[in-house]
Amino acid sequence: MVTIRPDEISSIIRKQIKQYNQEVEVVNIGIVLQVGDGIARIHGLDEVMAGELVEFEDGTVGIALNLESNNVGAVLMGDGLMIQEGSSVRATGKIAQIPVSDAYSGRVVNALAQPIDGRGKITASESRSIESPAPGIISRRSVYEPLQTGLIAIDSMIPIGRGQRELIIGDRQTGKTAVATDTIINQKGQDVICVYVAIGQKASSVAQVVNIFQERGAMEYTIVVAETADSPATLQYLAPYTGAALAEYFMYKEQHTLIIYDDLSKQARAYRQMSLLLRRPPGREAYPGDVFYLHSRLLERAAKLSSQLGEGSMTALPIVETQAGDVSAYIPTNVISITDGQIFLSADLFNAGIRPAINVGISVSRVGSAAQIKAMKQVAGKLKLELAQFAELEAFAQFASDLDRATQNQLARGQRLRELLKQSQSAPLTVEEQIATIYAGANGYLDILEIVQVRKFLVQLREYLITNKPQFGEIIRSTRAFTEQAEALLKEAIQEHIELFLLREQK
């Protein structure tokens, strides 16, 4: 028979009492009233904050956006197919955050910064809020360093600086994404981290862009954030902020970053869908009243930081799609007013074979020549004016039968200048190549050539300069100015090559 010793029992009870830890856990729980179309109405989340993450029974996460007197409207970050009426919801006490680290370079992730390229997990020890406040006035400095796109038309007439916001606007199928991807390709070797955010696009289009980056060796310094057309509206709305948070991580580490939002029209549509389903009052074009704030708080995060913060930068190239060239619609006018200039792509120019189809007349960079090296200013100073005069003269010449010699010469020069601005996709040019190209056109060296010969001549001239006059490129790179020595070398190269070229063409 087992004997029970009272002293042993009392010592066990004492030990248990000592180990007992009195903790009170307060959990804010609500009940789903209604769910559907990516929206859930919840009753009972009394102390929930605006923008707080809420967790449903099936593990789906949502964001509380509408705080009303008798219920909370939350948007779902998932399909929410397993959520039922009456199921419980828990407030997490957190706001949307993503992990950030250097390991994100070269990866394709979704709006929650989770990898979707099948290459395994991304290790990260830090995290950043998806919605971070933009740098203040004292934290910034004016834009002064150029960000070269590799496209002659942009770098010469609509220059972009590090820390600038430059809108790329145009109808569908006018080459907006091509301008953005060429800019990323041109950052190779420039120590710039690029973030490409694809919002509401076809998965095949995103795959095509990623393939271009991989082929051109651009993926190693690029992060792709993708939410395709079949993603929930909430994730399409969040994707640009996720991209901005990833770019900010590098910016505050004293690095230069470039972020492309492709495109903000689709983000605005996703936000409109969410707002209408949450029964927020519609405004112009059925967009909610705060759609301006949607884009302004995103684009204000792009900055050139002050020397105290390490002079890092975040350059934003948002893309907006227009309908039949209408830039006076709601979203285009909003984004134009927020950004520091716009690159306008024209369907008419694109169809006429002028690619990139940049309408130089109405495109502008408000930072302007502050973001250009001295050499480019010296060579391309009058280019925009000459092209504008040519466009005016060309329109007039259609109705005039007999033109004087000077007008004919001006038209011939303008046609050749327009020809030299044409560029193939994924073929960005270095600054010295651009300067040589513009100099040849602006100083009349191309006037003796037929229009069809211009591009062939320029390609061969650039090759001739690299092989026979390498000092020209060295002078431009080291002094960043178009010196007398550089001009003499370039003149010599052009004259030598024109003779060779004409001899070859006559054969």
From Swiss-Prot:
InterPro entries in the cross-refs: ATP_synth_asu-like_sf (IPR023366), ATP_synth_asu_C (IPR000793), ATP_synth_asu_C_sf (IPR038376), ATP_synth_F1_a_nt-bd_dom (IPR033732), ATP_synth_F1_asu (IPR005294), ATPase_a/bsu_AS (IPR020003), ATPase_F1/V1/A1_a/bsu_N (IPR004100), ATPase_F1/V1/A1_a/bsu_N_sf (IPR036121)
Keywords tagged on the record: ATP synthesis, ATP-binding, CF(1), Chloroplast, Hydrogen ion transport, Ion transport, Membrane, Nucleotide-binding, Plastid, Thylakoid, Translocase, Transport
GO cellular component, one term: chloroplast thylakoid membrane
Subcellular location: Plastid, Chloroplast thylakoid membrane
Membrane protein topology class: Peripheral membrane protein
Molecular function, one GO term: ADP binding
Statement: the UniProt record of this protein carries the keyword Nucleotide-binding: yes
Binding site for ATP: 170-177
Catalytic activity: ATP + H2O + 4 H(+)(in) = ADP + phosphate + 5 H(+)(out)
Tree of life domain: Eukaryota
A Pfam family assignment: ATP-synt_ab_C
EC number of the protein: 7.1.2.2
Keyword Cell wall biogenesis/degradation applies: no
Function: Produces ATP from ADP in the presence of a proton gradient across the membrane. The alpha chain is a regulatory subunit.
Quaternary structure and partners: F-type ATPases have 2 components, CF(1) - the catalytic core - and CF(0) - the membrane proton channel. CF(1) has five subunits: alpha(3), beta(3), gamma(1), delta(1), epsilon(1). CF(0) has four main subunits: a, b, b' and c.
Family membership noted in the UniProt record: Belongs to the ATPase alpha/beta chains family.
Protein name: ATP synthase subunit alpha, chloroplastic
Organism this protein belongs to: Cycas taitungensis
